[in-house]
Every structure is written in C-alpha cells, then in structure tokens.
A protein has these predicted regions:
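NAD(P)-dependent dehydrogenases' Rossmann-like dinucleotide-binding region
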Residues: 141
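Unchanged
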Residues: 9, 23-127, 131-137, 146-154
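N-terminal strand-loop-strand
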Residues: 1-19
Length: 154
C-alpha cells in the first residue's frame, strides 16, 4: 500500500500519514479523476501506471472531510517524484500487514470533555534512507484501511 507523510506546515492534518489524494476541483469528472490528478500532483504517479479497481464507500472524517477512497494497482516502472511542499515522505506498507486485524488498534481519548475513539495501525518500516522507522497510521487513514479489510473479507 502506497502511503505518504504530509509535511508539517500544511494547514490540514500536518505531519500525518495519508493516502495520496486531495480536494476535488470543478473540472474533475468524478472521484477517480480527482484521485488520479492528486496522486500525480503529490507523488508524480502518472495515470498510465495505475489500474483502477474502483471506489470504496464514502468516508466522513471527524473533522468533516468527505472522502471517496479510490483503489487501484500501481504497475511496475513508476518512480516517485514527491511534491516537497505537500509530501514529506512516500513509503509502502505490505497489504498483508494492513489487512491483518491483529495489527489494528483501538484508542479512546477525551478532548474538551468529549470522548473520541480512533483506530491506528502502527508500522515499523524503513525510510527512504534505509533506516528503521516507526510510522503511526491512524485516524481516517487507518479507518479507511479497516473498511478495505472489511470489504475484502466480506
């Protein structure tokens, strides 16, 4: 699974782990067009390297964003070219790890007197320099991965 870490200076979700993607523009034909355009802008993924499988159900984040996850395979030959303004790092996590419910964690915190629950999928991987690194995949990204898991095992 191809994931990114957002740069720390972004207004929305700075420093968090996310999928390549972003806001729809008026000229985008649909969610797939948005996903492909944003993936190209953020990580240099050209559409010729993507075999789109389809969309997962829409997901609404705790902060009110409405996300339509688009799922596809990336063909061999793609070279990452990340936009340094938006993307601090691009990395991969094996799908087998992400789809193993033993790796899914539930958390609960209280913020301003309101109990909030969220999922995480901690991953111990290797960064672009080959150094060991811990990644904390959580919130909407972890929840959408959990939805993918539920979809695949149904």
């Amino acid at each position: 699974m191809l994931l990114t870490q957002r740069t720390d200076h972004l207004t929305d979700h700075p420093g968090q782990i996310s999928f390549p993607g972003g806001r729809a523009e008026d000229f985008d034909a649909d969610a797939i067009a948005t996903a492909l355009r944003e993936a190209h802008e953020e990580i240099g993924l050209e559409t010729r390297f993507v075999d789109v499988l389809g969309e997962l159900p829409t997901y609404t984040t705790g902060t009110g964003f409405i996300v339509t996850p688009v799922v596809g395979f990336v063909d061999p030959g793609f070279t990452v070219n990340a936009d340094p303004f938006e993307v601090a790092e691009v990395f991969e996590v094996p799908l087998s790890f992400l789809m193993n419910p033993a790796n899914h964690r539930r958390h609960a915190v209280e913020l301003n007197g309101v109990r909030r629950e969220f999922l995480s999928i901690p991953w111990e991987g290797v960064d672009a320099q080959g150094e060991p690194r811990r990644y904390f995949i959580w919130g909407a990204t972890a929840a959408m991965l959990r939805n993918l898991y539920r979809f695949l095992v149904a």
